[in-house]
Design a protein with these regions (language model features):
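A small/polar active-site loop signature that marks catalytic segments
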Residues: 277, 283-445
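Hydrophobic single-pass membrane-targeting/anchoring helices
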Residues: 29-98, 527, 531
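Active-site SXXK
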Residues: 159, 173-191, 281, 309-310, ...
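Short, well-structured active-site flanking segments
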Residues: 188-203, 323-325, 444-447
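Beta-lactamase-like hydrolase cores
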Residues: 85-169, 239-248
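Active-site-adjacent helix/loop patches that line small-molecule binding or acyl-intermediate pockets
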Residues: 197-203, 208-268, 276-306, 354-393
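N-terminal targeting leaders characterized by basic, low-complexity, disordered sequences
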Residues: 1-22
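Small-residue-rich helix-loop
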Residues: 381-531
């Protein structure tokens, strides 16, 4: 994503300060005048998919998802799906299972079910490298791309590279770094791992500590797109209050513990609306507005604000709170301050995040930087490295090295890709995706199902027009910084084979033109049928 100019940073500071001012109470609107509840993305997308299946069932049965011209028949449902432009929705009560595949782009997911070593969705031979080069070489020379450019295409069924130009060059990956973060986190912590936020009470005291576990999706909101699946600070307050009352306690000293994370909280790019401070405790990603994704004004103290909100929620449950008398930096007699829970502290209550696989999907679909940094630290934690930027760098590298992935020249200065010091190669990005698409690694499936679908979801919702051959076919993670554009993902070609690709370029001067050039390359891979 583009870096901020000085005036933009100043404007962000003004917005943050404004967001911290008390807000007037919202007027009550009669129920009869309220707008109907907005349908969730999966409901809209699934509805469009159902209509498309009903209309095209006969054609698909006869000829699969492609018509005689090589156009994907599901594209006729494009218009209906545009209303769902927010990306994969994880709303609803979360089960212990990994998330189901997004209902869009079934041809891509169909290829994922093939046995290892098969054609991944088709029995036709892999594309011919020379023929594919004849299509991609001219596109890679597009003047909209910067002076440094690289591209790799791999046949997922065989693992064979069918196209490569500068694939081993370590370039700035921008947000495609999140693919590496996702694979490392899922490999080290596991797809079913959940992040815990808890409350404890010190023995023989009324000292209650809110302990952050690093859950970036913890929410204090009553309603929201993730309120049904994300861990709720409100639920934690209710359960904590119940446990305290069972002990005969209705007045406590409240503090909060963020000691799980070490090192600098501030991302190297400085204060920025693209992410909050990297803290083990936050609610709603420290957002000062009602957004759930994208840039937003952020709190300068997400942990303190979350603890303050928790105190308010406890008081709503009849528990009077005060600051821990021994806490450093307490603000006044009622606001909780930071502390560290002792090993002897007794559990009161806890809430857990959705499975890591669901967090990965949300991160990739919306390019969520807060989740990315949290997953990098979960990787460090699982790898027994310091839970910091440096520790996460070592942990991600170590996990990918275990998987024997190509790491020459790589650096993970952060987990999100916002740091321009990050380095990756098209060879690594494509290898990560090929591994995630391999049925031998079901723990990585959410890396593929979380990729935005061209013209349908997440950061690709506006990138592909409805008449583009890549619409609904290309699934890819985008990456954008000033002068940097990347695209890495999967397609199922006209012969039904699953291919993975990674395209990188630096030194671009027109981001829209560069994005268009990369999108055309991905579409060309999907429609080539090169022999």
């Amino acid at each position: 994503m583009p870096e901020l100019k000085p005036w933009q940073k100043t404007w962000q500071q003004v917005r943050r300060l404004a967001g911290q001012l008390p807000k007037p109470p919202a007027p009550k609107i009669p129920a009869a005048l309220r707008a109907p509840a907005k349908l969730k993305t999966w409901q809209l997308t699934a509805g469009a998919a159902t209509v498309g299946l009903a209309v095209a069932a006969g054609a698909v049965a006869a000829a699969g998802p492609w018509d005689s011209s090589g156009q994907r028949t599901a594209e006729r449902d494009w218009a209906a799906s545009q209303e769902a432009g927010g990306g994969t929705d994880h709303g609803g009560r979360t089960s212990g299972r990994a998330p189901a595949a997004a209902p869009s782009a079934p041809s891509v997911l169909r290829g994922l079910g093939a046995p290892v070593g098969s054609a991944h969705g088709g029995s036709a031979p892999a594309p011919d490298g020379k023929a594919l080069a004849g299509v991609l070489d001219p596109l890679l020379k597009d003047k909209a791309l910067g002076p440094e450019r690289s591209a790799v295409v791999i046949d997922a069924g065989t693992g064979r590279r069918v196209y490569g130009k500068g694939g081993g060059d370590a370039l700035t990956p921008a947000s495609t770094t999140k693919i590496a973060t996702a694979v490392a986190a899922l490999t080290s912590a596991g797809a079913d791992h959940r992040i815990t936020t808890k409350t404890v009470i010190e023995p023989d005291s009324k000292d209650v500590v809110l302990v952050g576990g690093g859950d970036p999706t913890l929410t204090a909101r009553k309603d929201g797109p993730y309120s049904g699946s994300a861990a709720s600070l409100r639920e934690l307050a209710e359960d904590t209050a119940r446990a305290l009352k069972d002990r005969g306690t209705d007045k406590v000293n409240l503090s909060y513990d963020t000691s799980l994370y070490t090192g600098e909280q501030q991302h190297p790019i400085g204060p920025n609306e693209n992410l909050t401070l990297v803290s083990a405790l936050m609610a709603d990603e420290g957002r000062l507005d009602d957004s759930s994704s994208g840039p937003a004004p952020r709190s300068g103290d997400p942990a303190g604000d979350a603890a303050k909100k928790f105190a308010e929620l406890l008081e709503e449950q009849g528990i009077e709170t005060g600051a821990d008398a021994g806490a450093k930096g307490k603000k006044d007699g009622r606001e909780p301050g930071p502390s560290k829970a002792s090993d002897r502290a007794e559990s009161l209550a806890k809430v857990e995040s959705a499975p890591l696989s669901a967090l990965v999907e949300r991160m990739l679909t919306h390019s969520d930087n807060d989740i990315a940094e949290a997953l990098a630290r979960q990787t460090a934690l699982a790898s027994k490295e310091p839970v910091s930027f440096d520790g996460a760098d070592k942990a991600i590298n170590a996990q990918l090295k275990k998987a024997q992935l190509p790491l020459k020249g790589t650096k993970f200065a952060d987990g999100s890709g916002l740091d321009r010091a990050d380095r990756s190669s098209a060879e690594l990005l494509s290898a990560l995706l090929a591994r995630a698409a391999d049925p031998a690694h079901p723990e990585l499936r959410s890396v593929v199902t979380g990729l935005p679908v061209a013209g349908f979801t997440g950061t690709l919702v506006d990138r592909y027009p409805k008449d583009s051959p890549g619409t609904g076919v290309v699934r890819a993670k985008t990456g954008t910084l000033t002068g940097v554009n990347t695209l890495a993902g999967t397609v199922v070609d006209t012969d039904g084979r699953l291919l993975v690709f990674a395209f990188m370029t630096t030194g671009t001067t027109d981001p829209k033109a560069a994005q268009g050039a990369l999108d055309r390359m991905a579409s060309a891979v999907a429609t080539c049928g090169c022999r």
